[in-house]
Amino acid sequence: MKIGRDGRGGLLRLLLILVLLGLLGAVYPVGTGHFQVHAQISPGDLEVLEQTAESQVPEGIRFTVTARSSSEIDDIRVFFRIMGSVRRSGYTNMEFEPGAQVTATAFVQSGGTGNYFPPGTELEYSFEIRDKSGAEVRTQRELFIYLDDRFQWLTVTSGLITVYYYGEELQGRAEGMLNAAGQTLTLMMPVLGIAPTEPLRIVTYDRYRD
């Protein structure tokens, strides 16, 4: 059976996951928390004032945007794309009361049909806002990493591999996982005949119950 390039890339990631699961039970390999960015104001009358993406692990991500216009704003959507070797995209309508200045929210659930994204997943998102005059604005695409915001995350990195951990006392274990992942990549690249191009993010928890 022949395995295509995309299939080999997925197999390489799967092998890395199996190696790391042998080192620690609670590991999520994939692609912060809560952050806030300001969109550029559109040249027209319709403008975006503020936008946020907030991790709510393990349920999903909450998106919020505030916009205003001289005409009633009546349609807002958030577009998102999961980055990585297998890219998935979609959009959802946001909830708000129509008006000249509105704040809209939408919750993208993790775990829905074909829509599971583990901690460490990188997403790209943007908002589209329309008002009754026909004006429309699309914000610039922003990158967001889905991480559990209960913890202050630290990282160790080597090449394309990054291990996320919390608590300085766990740095040694994180470095061990980083080395194991790097060795697995080195061993498997000749076998699969590919060189990885996408970042690999490994999120590790101290205890299973976390």
Regions found by a protein language model. Name each.
Residues G4-L18:
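N-terminal Sec-pathway targeting helices
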Residues L14-I17, G112, L185:
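A residue-level detector for conformationally permissive "hinge/kink" positions
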Residues L18-L24:
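Core hydrophobic alpha-helical transmembrane segments of single-pass membrane proteins
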Residues L24-W153:
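Glycan-association/targeting regions that enable binding to alpha-glucans and other polysaccharides
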